[in-house]
From Swiss-Prot:
Name under which the protein is recorded: Glutamate-1-semialdehyde 2,1-aminomutase 1
GO biological process: protoporphyrinogen IX biosynthetic process
EC identifiers of the protein: 5.4.3.8
Keyword Ligase: no
SUPFAM superfamilies: PLP-dependent transferases
Major site of localization recorded for this protein: cytoplasm
Residues where N6-(pyridoxal phosphate)lysine is found: K268
Gene Ontology cellular component terms for the protein in this record: cytoplasm
Swiss-Prot/TrEMBL catalytic activity: (S)-4-amino-5-oxopentanoate = 5-aminolevulinate
Stored Gene3D superfamilies: Aspartate Aminotransferase, domain 1, Type I PLP-dependent aspartate aminotransferase-like (Major domain)
PANTHER family found in the cross-reference section: GLUTAMATE-1-SEMIALDEHYDE 2,1-AMINOMUTASE (PTHR43713), GLUTAMATE-1-SEMIALDEHYDE 2,1-AMINOMUTASE 1, CHLOROPLASTIC-RELATED (PTHR43713:SF3)
Cofactor(s) essential for the protein: pyridoxal 5'-phosphate
Length: 429
């Protein structure tokens, strides 16, 4: 049993000054009935807490750290930029350089606007879609998280295509009424929604690989079907690649699945661990944004030079060969988890995409939020705490994706599988 006494003390202090003791809800460890671990430093594939416990890190700051912790080139880029000044509120050349790199790698993007978070990117993309199409309704998918913008915090009702209800106090019924929600991977549900509301729908926003119900890839024909529907009805297709951008493939998820959206939202990896977001797309659409056009969006720290330098250095280092290694390592993980769970009689369903994967304690194939919710959450809670005590740091929620970095090797995968085997043996008796 690891010692967490310093983290426990730090959490008590944090709760005096922060809501729930954290600055983002999942960090509170509520879903695993544990005290959150306070981190001190990270290096490569490892992270160390304030009690001195070292873990193999599969959270990687919720995805951004694709090169691992404290990558020397990224740290050097940030340090050099900071020595020149942390922010100017004016254009800098590094903004243009990162924009060129993003445009080169992401098939749908001809022009890109930098912002400060993934939430800001999706909120701005929705406003752009509404302004461009002169329509108001948005279609999203149940269980998909697109940041905490009011228009997107909507819970699905019953039926195939139901106008939503607010999923958080403070979200107005008026905003909820403009958001249509259908199950993920359900093209027929989307078709019915368009048949009923097609002339009112400004855009469909979708994660090409869902990452906030666990990792759920698109079934064959799903993304293609959405592309066809939006084109037919004159709506825009928005890919939320905040999580999947540069995670699923060298050319992001849209390059891997060969489906081109009208607007793409990015974040996480393109900031190299610093706060950043971006949205981009076709020139004729993006030039509607001020000051080129009349659709307003602005930000004090948009294009912050520290984030731009960190992002540029991160994306610059990635090569197609990295993704071959990612897939090989995750295949090794999948095969090991499958063998152990079969031997230990633990039902498991595994999904993967590039450098992301997810697993659910269920015998059902997980293709949407309903099937994701069949996972045994009580088993997950116990499993999580046991894995943590063996030095494996995983997302403290069943419904979050798991990530690897260029610093993860077969050594880390095999150690994780050993811990998984021990955990299953312990929990199954």
């Amino acid at each position: 049993m690891l010692n967490y006494s310093k983290s426990e003390k730090a959490f008590k202090e944090a709760k005096k000054v922060l809501p729930g003791g954290v600055n983002s809800p999942v960090r509170a460890f509520n879903s695993v009935d544990a005290t959150p671990v306070f981190m001190d430093h990270g290096k490569g594939a490892y992270i160390t807490d304030i009690d001195g416990n070292e873990y193999i890190d599969y959270v990687l700051s919720w995805g951004p750290l694709i090169l691992g912790h404290a990558n020397p080139s990224v740290v050097d880029a940030i340090t050099k930029a900071a020595m020149k000044g942390t922010s100017f509120g004016t254009p800098t050349e590094i903004e243009t350089e990162l924009a060129k790199l993003v445009i080169e790698r992401v098939p749908s993007i001809e022009i890109v606007r930098m912002v400060s978070s993934g939430t800001e990117a999706t909120m701005s993309a929705i406003r752009l879609a509404r302004g461009y199409t002169k329509r108001e309704k948005i279609l999203k998918f149940e269980g998909s998280y697109h940041g905490h913008g009011d228009s997107l915090l909507i819970k699905a009702g019953s039926g195939v295509a139901t106008l939503g209800l607010p999923d958080s106090p403070g979200v107005t019924k008026g905003l909820a009424a403009d958001t249509i929600t259908v199950p993920y991977n359900d093209v027929e549900g989307a078709k019915l929604a368009f048949e009923k509301y097609g002339e009112e729908i400004a855009a469909v926003i979708v994660e090409p690989v869902a990452g906030n119900m666990g990792v759920v890839p698109p079934i064959e024909g799903f993304l293609e079907g959405l592309r066809d529907l939006t084109t037919k009805y004159g709506a825009l297709l928005i890919f939320d690649e905040v999580m999947t951008g540069f995670r699923v493939d060298y050319y992001s998820a849209q390059g891997y699945y060969v489906v081109t959206p009208d607007i793409t939202c990015l974040g996480k990896v393109i900031g190299g661990g610093l706060p950043v977001g971006a949205y981009g797309g076709k020139k004729e659409i993006m030039e509607q944004i001020a000051p080129a056009g009349s659709i307003y969006q602005a930000g004090t720290l948009s294009g912050n030079p520290l984030a731009m330098n960190a992002g540029f250095e991160t994306v610059r280092q990635l090569t197609p060969q990295h993704y071959d290694v990612f897939r090989s390592l995750i295949k090794r993980m999948e095969e090991g988890l499958t063998e152990i769970s079969t031997r230990r009689e633990v039902p498991i369903s595994i999904n993967k995409a590039g450098s992301m994967f997810g697993f659910f304690f269920t015998d059902q194939k997980v293709i949407n939020f309903d099937t994701a919710k069949t996972s045994n959450l009580e088993f997950f809670r116990n499993y999580y705490r046991e894995m943590l005590n063996q030095g494996i740091f995983l997302p403290p929620s069943q419904f979050e994706g798991v990530f690897i970095s260029t610093m993860h090797t077969e050594k880390e995968i095999d150690k994780t599988l050993e811990a998984f085997d021990h955990t299953c043996k312990t929990l199954r008796g």
